[in-house]
């Protein structure tokens, strides 16, 4: 069985933002190493329940043992599914509303550290990058078959890579000679495509391209938008959705969705008092994102880009 040597980022802050009630029904959309699930379960009474999602069977298997005490008490249910299926999976279990939903986005440390999964530019491994090992699309397929224009688009849009065209052009040339099947091959191509001066700044030169391919393979932004809209609709009054992001694209998406739901509607000019029915159904738990402390960043470098945002439901309006 795989082990999860995983330090959960913003653990206490993310669960504090949920305002857990002992008898509440909660959802952890990203089970991973079980850090957030355990924190919620420790605050639940026997009448409360947690539903934990993960599309990675390795995470489910690990937590069968890791959270065995709570499983035996019947306090937690594991759901092997993409969190884009949040509403469908919960409805199938007789749930129309829950009291809180937490997301810890990005790839878990065990997935990064398992060279065979192909997520990391630090290890030579088959180009894979699938979070759900049963899906067909892999990084190898993207790199070897997607047209030049599509590669440029994902490198720029998902990786914010300034040298997207140069990297895509060299990939196109190299794959015509032989298939690109390992992370090591891809790293060398990226290094050769990016000018030497640019390689010396901004961290590892392959970081942005690897991020872009991972997002494309797993449709991360699409499934996040779908799932977040479902979570916001599912929470009860005073229920909350708490989200930890690790890169700017995800954070901007979360910020935008939360803003859309918590902003006042367009009001007639000169309206002296905003009537109750025009007040938003949701509010931001804090106006600015919560970020890790210096001490947490020093202890865990992967925490440095983390941001936490949360939203609370104030009322349910029949639309």
From Swiss-Prot:
Its EC number is 2.1.1.199. It catalyses: cytidine(1402) in 16S rRNA + S-adenosyl-L-methionine = N(4)-methylcytidine(1402) in 16S rRNA + S-adenosyl-L-homocysteine + H(+). GO terms for cellular component: cytoplasm. It is found in: Cytoplasm. GO terms for molecular function: rRNA (cytosine-N4-)-methyltransferase activity. The keyword RNA-binding does not apply. InterPro entries: RsmH, SAM-dep_MeTrfase_MraW_recog, SAM-dependent_MTases_sf. GO terms for biological process: rRNA base methylation. It is an enzyme of class 2 (transferase). It comes from the Bacteria. Signal peptide: none annotated. SUPFAM superfamilies: Putative methyltransferase TM0872, insert domain, S-adenosyl-L-methionine-dependent methyltransferases. S-adenosyl-L-methionine binds at residues 34-36, 54, 83, 104, 111. Specifically methylates the N4 position of cytidine in position 1402 (C1402) of 16S rRNA. Belongs to the methyltransferase superfamily. RsmH family. This is Ribosomal RNA small subunit methyltransferase H. It comes from Lactiplantibacillus plantarum (strain ATCC BAA-793 / NCIMB 8826 / WCFS1). The lineage of its organism: Bacteria, Bacillati, Bacillota, Bacilli, Lactobacillales.
């Amino acid at each position: 069985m795989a082990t999860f040597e995983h330090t959960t980022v913003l653990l206490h802050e993310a669960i504090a933002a949920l305002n857990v009630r002992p008898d509440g029904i909660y959802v952890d959309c990203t089970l991973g190493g079980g850090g957030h699930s355990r924190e919620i379960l420790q605050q639940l009474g026997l009448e409360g329940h947690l539903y934990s999602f993960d599309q990675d069977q390795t995470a489910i298997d690990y937590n069968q043992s890791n959270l065995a005490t709570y499983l035996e008490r019947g306090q937690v249910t594991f759901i092997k599914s993409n969190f884009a299926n949040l509403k469908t999976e919960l409805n199938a279990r007789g749930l129309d509303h829950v009291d809180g939903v937490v997301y810890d986005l990005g790839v878990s440390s065990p997935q990064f550290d398992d060279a065979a999964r192909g997520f990391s530019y630090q290890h030579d491994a088959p180009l894979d990058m699938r979070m759900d090992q049963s899906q067909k699309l892999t990084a190898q397929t993207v790199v070897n078959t997607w047209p030049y224009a599509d590669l440029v688009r994902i490198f720029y849009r998902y990786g914010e890579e300034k040298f997207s065209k140069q990297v895509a052009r060299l990939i196109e040339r190299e794959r015509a000679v032989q298939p690109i099947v390992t992370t090591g091959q891809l790293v060398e191509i990226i290094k050769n495509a990016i000018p030497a001066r640019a390689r010396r700044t901004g961290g590892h030169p392959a970081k942005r391209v690897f991020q872009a391919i991972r997002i494309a393979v797993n449709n991360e932004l699409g499934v996040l938008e779908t799932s977040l809209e479902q979570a916001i609709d599912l929470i009860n009054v005073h229920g909350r959705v708490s989200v930890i992001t690790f890169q700017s694209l995800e954070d901007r998406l979360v910020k935008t969705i939360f803003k859309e739901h918590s902003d006042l509607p367009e009001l007639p000019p000169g309206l002296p008092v905003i009537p109750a029915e025009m007040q938003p159904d949701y509010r931001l738990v804090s106006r600015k994102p919560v970020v890790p402390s210096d001490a947490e960043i020093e202890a865990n470098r992967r925490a440095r880009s983390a941001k936490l945002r949360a939203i609370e439901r104030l009322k349910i309006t029949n639309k």
